[in-house]
Amino acid sequence: MDQKKLLKNIGIGLGAIVLFLLLSYGYVPQVLDGKIVNQSDISGYMGMSHEMNEWNAAHPDDPTYWTDSMFGGMPTTAISTQNGGDYTQSIYNLLLTGKRPATYLFIALLGAFLLMLALGISWPLALGGAVAVAFCSYNFQIIQVGHNTKMQAIAFFPWVLAALVYTYRSTKGKGRWLAKTLLGAVLFGVALSMQVKANHQQITYYLAILVLLYALVELIDVLTKNKDRIGRFFVASALLLVVGCVGIATNVNKLLPLAKYTPHTMRGGSELTQDGDVKGGGLDLDYATAWSYGWEELPNLMIPNFNGGASAQAVDPAKSETIKLLKRAGQSNTREIAKSLPMYWGPQPFTAGPMYMGAITVFLFILGLFCYKGKEKWWLVVGTVIAVLMAVGNHFMAFTKFCFNVLPLYNKFRTVSMALVVLQVTLPMLGFLALDRIVKDWVEPKDFLKKSGIAFALTGGLCLLFFLIPTLAGDFTAASDAGQQDVLVEAFQQDRIALLRQDALVSFILIAVAWGLLLWALLPKDAPRYRKLIAGVAICALVTVNLFTTGKRYLNADHFTTPKDFGKPFAERPVDQMIKADPDPSYRVLDLSVNVFNSSIPSYHHKSVGGYSPAKLQRYQDLIEHYLTGEINAVYGSMQEAKTIDEVEAGLPATPVLNALNTRYIVVGGDYAPVYNKAALGNAWFVDEAVRAASPDEEIAFLGSVDLRHQAVIGKDMPDVTFAPADSTDTIVLASYAPNELRYHYKAAGNRLAVFSEIYYPDGWKAQVDGTPADVLRSDWTLRSMALPAGEHDIVMRFEPDSYRVGAGISRASSITLILLLLLSLGGMFLPARKK
């Protein structure tokens, strides 16, 4: 590359970076004032991670991989990924430098720009294509609710594809093709390392499907059209495979603990039987497909409010029939109500918004089906179709069951509608490939008129049809309308129709203008060449304005708050202060002032019985379903007639499982004293008898029939233990508490079986009695137990999972290898030039 061209490319790159910074920070200027997005999921993270973060900050040389803050205790595997050993983590952190979420948008824009360039798209159009990828509405929705890891994984998605495409295209060159191919493969490994580092395996899974499809398309191409490049294809594929594995291996410090943890979680399935069948490994199919995209929702890919938009949708209070009705009924604060009306009427339980890809993007994609002849079309079309079939989930159960039962790991994922993130890259890629070829005069004007007319009819025509006859979309009623007054439901319907018609008209106009610009540029035949560039740039501008303004529906100034206000839910209440006055180092709290199993706010202050996590331990989930929910409801019931805390305490029902979890305090409100549960069994106790269960079903059933204070239920997979009944002189106490280490002191007149009110987990908890290793057993379905010798002894339990140590070692070696490969491949690009 000559110096002039190099300087030009550097200028284009720097210009793109400046533009993307302006777009990213211009979209969320609030971050420049120190504000943050009021994200519900991040609020939940703050609660569940508080104990871990506090400990790790105070003990950096002894980090904890366990927390007792949620669900009685669980590994931090699904909470934190800050594990040592990965030297490429510094690169990741550097890329994320800046104010979030602006930095997420910037990374997505830059990666998509590189992808468009790798596909051979001219840089002015590549800028527009980058916006079409990064500013899809779904990205703003997940940022607003706090799915940050998902957004990071999506942001690095196009980086991986860009390196993949560059690698295979490098095999076509005549000079230095091997050096370029090696560089591409190494960049692929680095990009994949970053994408996996985001720690959202489901997005990575969809990315893997696209990667495999592209490799397959390349293989078919060399076998059918370019047999002289078969050798180069296999060289490139081998390099991609090897270096890609190295890139993934840099994350083994996270992946190995996760692999150990997943089989024990809800994603690993339950050991219990249901209707005579043992549940297989993986999520329940109904649970996994609860959020399935309906076939009837697909038009909202180009008409955002086709199905009402969001479950809590903002409407114009001056035009809304619902708001007018409420005003006539004397309702106050209608302006606030107008910000959150139940407009969504699709088949999903609820949604933050549609998967709007952009009306012009969809038009260009359809146009690409007819106008673009390159092999990439089939890659993108097949990828799009597979993603749609996955996303519709329970609306095409035959395909879903096939994927669930056949595809490796697929049954570990939920919210199948997420597969539509694939369309965020496939639709803009094919659409802007087509636009690029049109601008470059690769399309015959006469042929274009016919094909573009068909594309316009299929997209703009459909939008116009729904504007004129909106009832073609359905009856505009939602499941959430049930129980509402007919007059209110009718108002909802009118608003939903208005939302559809408004967006259908806007989408029609956008598509019509884009089509008109292309016709103006190509017809007549002697039209000046500059028209095509003007048309292309104008279309890019339209895409930007449309996605920018539509995205503001889901992420705008109203969603930002100050860090101080964001932390208010975690402010210490009077009841928290009262509980913390207890000198005992460990006990559990049941907070009835929140949704017990869907809130981690209590975990910020206490060791909670509840919490929120879609990856909680399956045995604890079984305990919730079989016992805890019933016992909590019984507590609620006993409180109905009580007028004082003392009356609540006196009237507490029998709650044997809560007692075994050492649930000492029950919170009924932030300003009230806590209810003291005198029946809590404490941190540890000796039992008189072991009750052996013949099956998991029998094991959990015994919890409802035995006396957990004096009997321990032992599963069939646990070894036999010999011990004598407890004596009145026996004692066992918790001497010190840390999330990753528990110390007990006990005295026993004979050999004993001790049960601890701590959650059992097989991979990592190691125990010693006076320095001698001892086995940690499982009792009472979820609790730890130990067979202890007679006498006076000290017990130390430490959580030291081998997976973290081994994973860190592999990550260390892999990250060093990847960094060296990157340096060598970059050097290899310059060596031939220097020799000349």
Regions found by a protein language model. Name each.
Residues 12-48, 242-256, 386-389, 464, ...:
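Transmembrane signal-anchor helices characteristic of membrane glycosylation enzymes that use polyprenol
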Residues 20-109, 115, 131-143, 147-155, ...:
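Membrane-interface coil-to-helix junctions
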Residues 51, 56, 60-82, 294, ...:
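Extracytoplasmic/lumenal acceptor-recognition loop(s) of multi-pass membrane glycoenzymes
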Residues 103-120, 361-364, 430:
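Transmembrane-helix motifs of polytopic, lipid-linked glycan transferases
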Residues 116-135, 175-183:
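Transmembrane-helix signature of polytopic, membrane-embedded enzymes
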Residues 145-156, 167-171, 178-193, 201-244, ...:
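Contiguous transmembrane helix-bundle modules in multi-pass membrane proteins
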Residues 203, 233-293, 305:
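Polar, glycine-rich mid-to-C-terminal structural blocks
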Residues 363, 706-836:
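Active-site-proximal, structured, solvent-exposed surfaces of multi-pass membrane proteins
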